[in-house]
Curated annotation (Swiss-Prot):
GO MF terms, alphabetically ordered: heme binding; iron ion binding; oxidoreductase activity, acting on paired donors, with incorporation or reduction of molecular oxygen, reduced flavin or flavoprotein as one donor, and incorporation of one atom of oxygen
Gene Ontology, cellular component aspect: endoplasmic reticulum membrane
Membrane topology recorded in Swiss-Prot or TrEMBL: Peripheral membrane protein
Source species of the chain: Mus musculus
The protein's name: Cytochrome P450 2B9
Modified positions (Phosphoserine) in chain numbering: 128
Annotated residues for binding of heme: 436
Cofactor(s) named in the record: heme
Gene Ontology annotations of biological process type: response to stilbenoid
Enzyme class, spelled out: oxidoreductase
Amino acid sequence: MDPSVLLLLAVLLSLFLLLVRGHAKIHGHLPPGPHPLPLLGNLLQMDRGGLLKCFIQLQEKHGDVFTVHLGPRPVVVLCGTQTIREALVDHAEAFSGRGTIAAAQLVMQDYGIFFASGQRWKTLRRFSLATMKEFGMGKRSVEERIKEEAQCLVEELKKYQGVPLDPTFLFQCITANIICSIVFGERFDYTDDQFLHLLNLMYKIFSLLSSFSGQMFELFSGFLKYFPGVHRQIVKKQQELLDYIAHSVEKHKATLDPSAPRDYIDTYLLRMEKEKSNHNTEFHHQNLMMSVLSLFFAGTETTSATLHYGVLLMLKYPHVTEKVQKEIDQVIGSHRLPTLDDRTKMPYTDAVIHEIQRFSDLVPIGLPHKVIKDTLFRGYLLPKNTEVYPVLSSALHDPQYFEQPDKFNPEHFLDANGALKKCEAFLPFSTGKRICLGESIARNELFIFFTTILQNFSVASPVAPKDIDLTPKESGIGKIPPAHQIYFLAR
């Protein structure tokens, strides 16, 4: 054999051995898991069922804490209620970093409230919480905004008497309008072409991220990013959303009154001006753009999808619908809109909404975290920047807390006296320091929108209840509800 070929093989073998030794040195204290192949990681453990199915199967073999390799990238997976709460609550600071969602971060990188970590994230979260509270509790509270939107929804659905519709984008409209009123200072008509285009972009992004192709990109992003694929579609759609946000920011700048900020963007612009001499400020244009995109996206997709699943579940389980409507009729009647004060008087309806969130399980593998320092967890040393996946589905289907975890049963959230009971396994918004920023708004939206729909309409389908398929279109980072034609019949 040619000496130069032998030399090349020797160099490659040496590099491979160094890589393996380096890998063991860096990751030697991580929890055990399935043996990874070089570069491919645990690809062989995956099938068309995606990451969630893979993680649940591995939990059965390796326990509640194990390591998988997404391609060459090691990730620690946390399963079960107690494990997740121990990490995200008991070790909240250590696990407060944001992990990688490769396709989304090609554009967003580590900017904005969603993908930031460390001091940047703390600063943006503190500002966003205060600002959303200010515009949600001021002259027009979030409740008033939701009730106004609920009334608009009723009027829109009345137009479809006797005609079935897929409510996907209508439910997106109502949830998006709440966050738009806080962030952009305006609501949109349901027929506004630009608004519908923006909603379609977000829906497509969420679908692509959740697709099997999106999950494959997550495994091999370092290599696949150089080739055509799903990630380029996501980047293009993100950029269209950012173009709209940039246009809105410029309009805000042109009409800004420092004495009377109208919304989140105005308040951020004023903070930017205040800190313009601070070279280390986090209040710059990049963080504004990415924070607005994050809020717009998070405030629309999961809540609208939960509401969509809620209606599908009412179609499939009409006996539950009857009990909800009976409680609505007794507590609210038919002549006024539901209010948040009604919730404490309606334990069955509240339990049904909780069970819809649990059963629909819309963010099954949770959003990735990373540890921000070397962390000792359950006897394993997780080096700084280790990525962590808290599998929320494993809590929402935890048999230690739910008697029938794979069945839709509102009794999961009712005690022996019919009162709503709390459950520490109920983690649809995650938990700890990175719990969903908009949890309170989302819970309020779900209660008012859901009760308003069933107060005013009976739901029906051309398909028999037993034949309604709840299998999601996509299941990855999120779940995309299946499309069904639904009749909304005035009561």
